[in-house]
């Protein structure tokens, strides 16, 4: 009987942990993208799967948005996201997004330059390491490699 009760408690704790694993992420985000970019819509679906309500804004003036967000030159990608007090540039893997909110560094945001294959929203298998950078005031520093 005790063994059964212990098993129930452990399984309940595991289920609670799985249900709250993404609790650190904000409830809402705004994704700015080029109107013709479908991979950005796919990236939004990945955030939505983590419980984030994503508003998509089609905007061809992404340069201004990136500059206001503090995205360094050369780190630009096809979309910029405002989420909580941070900006996310490009197809940053969800693991890095979650790490950003768990660690809460004093930065403007994180970014992954270009549109690497295998990242959220980009089809295909990962073919190279993903170097994710922290950025503030147009300056970038390494954050993590996935």
Where does each model-flagged region fall?
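Thiol/selenol-based redox catalytic cores and closely related redox-interacting motifs
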Residues: 68-146
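Bacterial N-terminal signal peptides
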Residues: 7-17
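Positively charged n-region of N-terminal signal peptides that target proteins for export
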Residues: 1-5
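Short active-site oxyanion
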Residues: 28-29, 52-54, 84-87
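Conserved helix-turn-beta segment immediately C-terminal to the redox Cys motif
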Residues: 44-64
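Local sequence-structure signature of Cys/Sec-based thiol-disulfide redox active-site neighborhoods
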Residues: 23-50
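Stable alpha-helical elements in mature extracytoplasmic
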Residues: 36, 43, 58-61, 93-97
């Amino acid at each position: 009987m005790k063994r059964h009760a212990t098993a129930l408690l452990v399984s309940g704790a595991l289920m609670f942990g799985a249900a709250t694993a993404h609790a650190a992420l904000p409830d809402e985000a705004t994704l700015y993208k080029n109107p013709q970019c479908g991979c950005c819509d796919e990236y939004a679906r990945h955030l939505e799967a983590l419980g984030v309500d994503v508003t998509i804004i089609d905007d061809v003036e992404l340069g201004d948005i990136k500059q206001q967000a503090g995205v360094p030159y050369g780190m630009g990608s096809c979309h910029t996201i405002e989420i909580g007090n941070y900006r996310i540039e490009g197809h940053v893997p969800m693991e890095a997004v979650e790490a950003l909110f768990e660690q809460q560094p004093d930065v403007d945001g994180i970014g992954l330059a270009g549109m690497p294959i295998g990242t959220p929203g980009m089809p295909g298998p990962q073919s190279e390491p993903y170097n994710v950078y922290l950025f503030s005031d147009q300056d970038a520093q390494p954050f993590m490699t996935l």
